[in-house]
Structure formats: C-alpha cells, structure tokens
Amino acid sequence: MRRIDFRFAELRANGRKALIPFITAGDPSLEATVPVMHALVRAGADVIELGVPFSDPMADGPTIQRSSERALGRGAGLAYVLEAVHEFRREDAATPVVLMGYLNPIEIHGTRRFAEAAVAAGVDGLLLVDLPPEEADETRAIFTEVGLALIALASPTTSEQRLDMLCSTAQGYLYYVSFAGVTGASNLLDTHAASDRLRQLRQRAGAPVVAGFGIKDAASAAAMAVDADGVVVGSALVAALAEADDVRSARERAEAFLAPLRQALDQA
C-alpha cells in the first residue's frame, strides 16, 4: 500500500499523471509475464495491474476473457500470479503492483491467508471486481491489517450513496470506469461525460482517481488524463501482447505499445 501512496505523491509533486497498464498473468505465456512487467516499467508504467485469470470474468470483454482462458489453460492460477510478483520484486522494489480479479479464488484460498501471502510476494493492492462496497468491510479490515490496499471501482451508474461510501473508504486509488460496460468497448467512451464525473470524484475522494475502460491509444489516454490522476490501459495492450511469438517479442510489443502513451501523458 505504501508503494502506491508514495508513487502518487511523487507523481503529484512532479505534475505528472499515472500510467497504469493492465496485463493478464500468464498471457501470452507463463515465461513472458515478468519480462513484460519489467518492459512496461522501462516504457513508463507507474503502477502495474496484473490480472488474476478467472473462468468467469463477468466485467471483461472478449479480449481479456480470451486472454484469461489462455492463461488458465497454461496453469496460471493464484499461486503462479503470486510467484510472478515475487520474481518481479527481485529486480524492482519500487513499482506498485495491484492484482485485479474476482472474489472466488481468494475465498477458496482464504482471505487472510491470501492477503498475507500477497504481501509476502510484494503485492500492494487488490481490485476485486465483484466485491460490493457494502460487503467489503471485513475484507478491507484484513487487507489494511497486513498492508494491502483495497482498490474501489466506481462507474457512471454508481449511486450517490455508494459513491459517498467509496470516496470515504478509498485506499490506494479510486478506479473510475468511464462507461457502464465491459472492458475493451472503446466505442462507448464519452470523454466529456467522464471528465465531468472525474472532476467531481477528485474533489470528494480521499485518494487519487484514475480512469479506465475504453482507453486504447495515446490520444484517448491524454484526453482522459486531463481530469484524472492517471489512466489505466488494458484490452488494447492485452490484444497487442496476444500476437507475440516469444518472450522477446512480448517485451518489444509491451514497450512499443506503452511508450507513446507515456509521451502523450507527459506532453498533455
């Protein structure tokens, strides 16, 4: 959690926006995950969101669903994800890593047992897509005790009552879903409506606010970052990595995809 707080404080002090790439652990291969994470940092990533493969990713569009299926087919379960973070930490002790996934694998593992293992591996936060904020108190308490941030999600359809709850309990950063849909549906992105909401959230939230869903290139990243503390890019990056033939190709694709977004954010 402290790595996330430090990174956003550092960015704020330098007048920069956070660039947060999402990749699925285990895709395009088990061997590529950690090298791709390092490549993303070289290309300008400030935080890495690492997707935990799940058999029923309801919030994800076809690109990430297929990515998750491929990763599961290779055996990329929760243990693999934590080992990947542990390996990443051998060379990078500074870049925050947030796991994004669903409740079921964690509940099977045991929430406290998982949380302790995640911290030991070097994880900084969790974004649990299907954990309602009204039911998050126990999980948040366990995570806070061990030093994990429970990242919250808000969307255009989130009620004012729920927004008040999310803003008052936000840890790490608040992830604003720029439209009501699944990941990758960039045709639904309305930057004007999202910008209005982002400005409101930044005034209310006790943590930085980042925007995700529908960000696919440098132009959309720069547009969304104007009124946010950072942006998350996922499906477009996952699609680019899916075409990689080997680890070297995956690294090169990761850097080639992310570097223009970093440049656009720094010039905006």
From Swiss-Prot:
Pathway: Amino-acid biosynthesis; L-tryptophan biosynthesis; L-tryptophan from chorismate: step 5/5. Signal peptide: none annotated. The active site is at E49 (proton acceptor), D60 (proton acceptor). The keyword Lyase applies. Coiled coil: none annotated. It catalyses: (1S,2R)-1-C-(indol-3-yl)glycerol 3-phosphate + L-serine = D-glyceraldehyde 3-phosphate + L-tryptophan + H2O. It holds the Pfam family Trp_syntA. Keywords: Amino-acid biosynthesis, Aromatic amino acid biosynthesis, Lyase, Tryptophan biosynthesis. Its EC number is 4.2.1.20. CDD domains: Tryptophan_synthase_alpha (cd04724). It comes from the Bacteria. GO terms for cellular component: cytosol. GO terms for molecular function: tryptophan synthase activity. SUPFAM superfamilies: Ribulose-phoshate binding barrel. PANTHER family: TRYPTOPHAN SYNTHASE ALPHA CHAIN, CHLOROPLASTIC (PTHR43406:SF1), TRYPTOPHAN SYNTHASE, ALPHA CHAIN (PTHR43406). Belongs to the TrpA family. The alpha subunit is responsible for the aldol cleavage of indoleglycerol phosphate to indole and glyceraldehyde 3-phosphate. Tetramer of two alpha and two beta chains. This is Tryptophan synthase alpha chain. The lineage of its organism: Bacteria, Pseudomonadati, Pseudomonadota, Gammaproteobacteria, Lysobacterales. The gene is trpA.
